[in-house]
């Protein structure tokens, strides 16, 4: 499925927080390195939770990454010997990320992106739905609901231990102090009808 001698393609890894998206991205990048392929990893500058220059999973796995402010800055770091381009926290990139990913895949690169497919309200997040639509491979991961133990497909934002309101700002970078994985039935967003 992931032969490098094929022309370029797009892989999307998505799901809720704590579902293992960054861990899976790191695993795929490490596999390419074992195969002596050249990979480069990018992350948005806004994601500085664990490290400024690494993609770090919640369980501590990490890989070196290039922080970028704008999607098109990715092009400045691509060289001909690259085989694989990986992008973590893709939901935080600007709208140009879809075009950037398309161009890279069309140029023959394997492009792996990872990100949240839904925001804390349970709505499609950023450009991830568009990337899912154009990808050759989509992997949707689930966490475990912190309230009941069921498979969790949503991310619950908590403010002082209570669910955040529907009209709170969409982007709030954080980890377990601000977010929990939840299933459809335990996910709560005050002032929104289900």
Curated annotation (Swiss-Prot):
Keyword tags: ATP-binding, Cytoplasm, DNA synthesis, Kinase, Metal-binding, Nucleotide-binding, Transferase, Zinc
GO biological process terms on file: DNA biosynthetic process; thymidine metabolic process
Residues spanning the membrane: none
Binding site for Zn(2+): 145, 148, 183, 186
Gene Ontology MF terms in the entry: ATP binding; thymidine kinase activity; zinc ion binding
Pfam families per the UniProt record, alphabetical: TK
EC code(s) of this entry: 2.7.1.21
Top-rank lineage group of the source organism: Bacteria
Residues at which ATP binds: 15-22, 88-91
SUPFAM superfamilies: Glucocorticoid receptor-like (DNA-binding domain), P-loop containing nucleoside triphosphate hydrolases
Keyword Kinase: yes
Binding site for substrate: 120, 170-174, 179
Subcellular location: Cytoplasm
GO cellular component: cytosol
Catalytic activity: thymidine + ATP = dTMP + ADP + H(+)
Active-site feature positions: 89
InterPro entries documented for this protein: P-loop_NTPase, Thymidine_kinase, Thymidine_kinase_CS
Similarity comment: family membership: Belongs to the thymidine kinase family.
Subunit structure: Homotetramer.
Protein's UniProt name: Thymidine kinase
Organism phylogeny: Bacteria, Bacillati, Bacillota, Bacilli, Bacillales
């Amino acid at each position: 499925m992931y032969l490098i001698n094929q022309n370029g393609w797009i892989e999307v890894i998505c799901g809720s927080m704590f579902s293992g998206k960054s861990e899976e991205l790191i695993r795929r990048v490490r596999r390419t390195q074992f195969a002596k392929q050249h990979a480069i990893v990018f992350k948005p500058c806004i994601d500085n939770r664990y490290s400024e220059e690494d993609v770090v999973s919640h369980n501590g796995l990490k890989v070196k990454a290039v922080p970028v402010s704008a999607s098109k800055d990715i092009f400045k770091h691509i060289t001909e010997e690259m085989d694989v381009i990986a992008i973590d926290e893709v939901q935080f990139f600007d709208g140009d990320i879809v075009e950037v990913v398309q161009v890279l895949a069309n140029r023959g690169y394997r492009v792996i992106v990872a990100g949240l497919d839904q925001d804390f309200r349970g709505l499609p997040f950023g450009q991830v739905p568009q990337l899912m639509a154009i990808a050759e491979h989509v992997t949707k991961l689930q966490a475990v609901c912190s309230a009941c133990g069921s498979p969790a497909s949503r991310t619950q934002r908590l403010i002082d231990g209570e669910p955040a309101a529907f009209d709170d700002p969409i982007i709030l970078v954080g980890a377990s102090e601000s977010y929990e994985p939840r299933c459809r039935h335990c996910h709560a967003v005050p002032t929104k009808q289900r």
